[in-house]
Amino acid sequence: MIRRRLLLTAALLCCLTTPPLHADERPHTAQPNVHVLAPMHMFGLDRERVVRVYLPPSYESTSKRYPVLYMHDGQNLFDDATSFIGEWGVDEMMNELARTQQLEVIVVGIDHGDEKRMTELNPWDNDKVGKGEGRDYLRFVVGIVKPYVDAHYRTLPDRAHTAMLGSSLGGLISHFAMYEYGDVFSRIGIFSPAYWIAPEVREFTRAHALAPGARVWFYAGSMEDSEMVANMDAIVEIMRAQRASAPALRVEVTPGAVHNEQAWRAEFPHAVEWLFEDAR
C-alpha cells in the first residue's frame, strides 16, 4: 500500500508537471477560439500564471452572455503541444456540444505551477510534499482571474452559472472550493480526486454544508490506485448524509479506466452536459 502511494505521488509529480520530451516539435492543436492571456500575478504566492480562455462558437456573432467553467492544469486542456501526454480536447468537445446540444460555455483554464502543483492544489499541509497553498491559489482564482474574466468577456457571473472542474489534485481543490466558495461556484466536477494526500478532507466535509442548489459530478476509474474509488465513495456518503444541504450528486466509475488524460477526456462531455443541464 505504501509503495503504491509513493508510486502515485511520483506519477503526480512527473506525469502532470514535467514537460514532455520534444514538446516543441508537436503541432499546436488549440482551436482558434482559445485565447492565451498574459501571465497574471498570484498575490500571496509571488508567482505568475498563464490563463487560457475558450470562447463559444457564437461569441463573436452575438451579444449573449455565457456560463463559465473554471478548470485547473490549463496546459493539458486545449493544446497537445503544451500538454504532457496528450490534451483533454476541451475546445473540440465544447465546440461539438455547442453544435449538437446547444450548450455554450466559456471555459477558463488556469495553468498549473509545475513543481509547485502538489502544494498549490492542496489546501492542507503534507509532510512529504510541503505546506499547502490551496487557499492562496483559490484566492487567486476568485479574486484575480474571475474578476478579470467577468470584466473582459460577456459572462453570466452569478453563482448559478459558474462552475469548477478538475482532476486528481484538481479534483481535490475543486472539492475544497465548493465549500469555501459556495457563494461563487454552484457546479463542481471532481475527477479522480487525490483525497489520499489530504486525509483532513473527510472531517472538513463533515463539518461543512454546501450552499443550496449545488450540483456535483464525481468520477473515477476502476483501475486507478486501490483506494481511489473507496475514498471517493466515503466522501459521497458523507455528503449524502447531510440531508439539509444534500446536493444533486452524480457518481460514475468507469471499468478499466486509469489515472490519465484519456480517461478524463472521455468523461468530460458527459459531466459538463449534466452540470449545466438546467443552466442553458
Task: Outline where the language-model segments fall.
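Sec/Tat signal peptide C-region and signal peptidase I cleavage site
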Residues: 19-23
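Non-catalytic cap/lid and distal C-terminal segments of serine-dependent acyl enzymes
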Residues: 24-280
